[in-house]
Design a protein with these regions (language model features):
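N-terminal localization/anchoring segments of enzymes in phospholipid and broader phosphate metabolism
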Residues: 1-273
Length: 273
């Protein structure tokens, strides 16, 4: 990768500056594409409302939906949302990458004290989208992120009474991998070994809610050990837009494309590949 080339220390000054310029351009393109994607998803959700499918957040719930979410937390979500206090972790990159995390700010009401914690959104257990009770003739769907936000008083129950703010972020570790040239293993096995080894890589890309306060951003970035030319992308509230492929149809199957079966190249199955 370009980051690795820069870190090698073997470049002449002219080459070094050229690569830095390319990386800055890539980061700018990332920001532009993110904005375009956000505009497109907003339009899609607006059009879904024409079909009586509505996306709600934690501030738009009626009493029935609030009670339903409380039961959902105690019946299912509780136990999958254990917080990690930010003061107890120096290196966030030891956590699993490509997952959605909420960094939670807890302001104690009875005294001037602020604490911070990280909560992983357990989307691989429950899915990214949850159908909640309908209202006003609409089928209602929530991001699991927002359900976790709603449940913060339950997650931190037993502690001091607090005001809560939560901001999402995710990080990606260095995806470059070295594949050993060992004829005793198939290509697929060697790739699998390479993928496993790259889990120990350093974070090279961080996406975060652009409404996250600057001082909190600094706390997160410092604990991720991000560098000058790593990709830092402030976006809207939600990340991992690929999860939209699993958005529930709410009974409107005509709104979804048919699924295509995956293809496997025979060459990848060969021991001689």
């Amino acid at each position: 990768s370009l980051n690795r080339i820069l870190e090698s220390g073997t470049l002449k000054k002219k080459e070094h500056n050229k690569i830095k310029k390319i990386l800055r351009l890539i980061n700018q393109l990332n920001a532009n594409f993110s904005q375009e994607y956000s505009t497109a998803t907003t339009e899609v959700f607006t059009r879904l409302e024409d079909h009586k499918i509505r996306l709600l957040n934690e501030t738009q719930l009626n009493n029935e939906q609030k009670q339903w979410l409380q039961h959902f937390f105690y019946d299912k979500l509780n136990g999958s949302t254990s917080p990690i206090w930010l003061s107890e972790i120096d290196n966030i990159s030891v956590l699993e990458d490509n997952r959605i995390y909420l960094v939670v700010k807890l302001d104690e009401i009875d005294r001037d004290k602020t604490r911070y914690a990280i909560v992983k959104v357990p989307d691989r257990v429950f899915g990214r989208f949850i159908i909640i009770p309908s209202s006003e003739g609409y089928d209602n769907v929530m991001y699991l992120d927002d359900i976790v936000r709603f449940c913060l008083p339950l997650i931190f129950i037993g502690g001091p009474k607090c005001r809560y703010e939560a901001y999402s972020f995710k990080f990606t570790k260095d995806a470059e991998m070295d594949i050993e040239n060992d004829s005793d293993y198939s290509t697929m096995e060697r790739i699998a070994q390479g993928v496993h080894s790259r889990k120990r890589g350093e974070p090279v890309r961080v996406i975060y809610d652009n409404k996250m306060p600057h001082d909190l951003q600094k706390k997160i970035m410092r604990r991720l050990n991000v560098r000058e030319l790593d990709t830092l992308l402030g976006t809207e509230r939600y990340q991992n837009h690929k999860d939209l492929m699993k958005f529930p149809s709410c009974g409107h199957k005509e709104l979804k494309y048919e699924s295509w079966p995956g293809l496997m190249k025979p060459e990848f199955l060969s021991e001689r590949s």
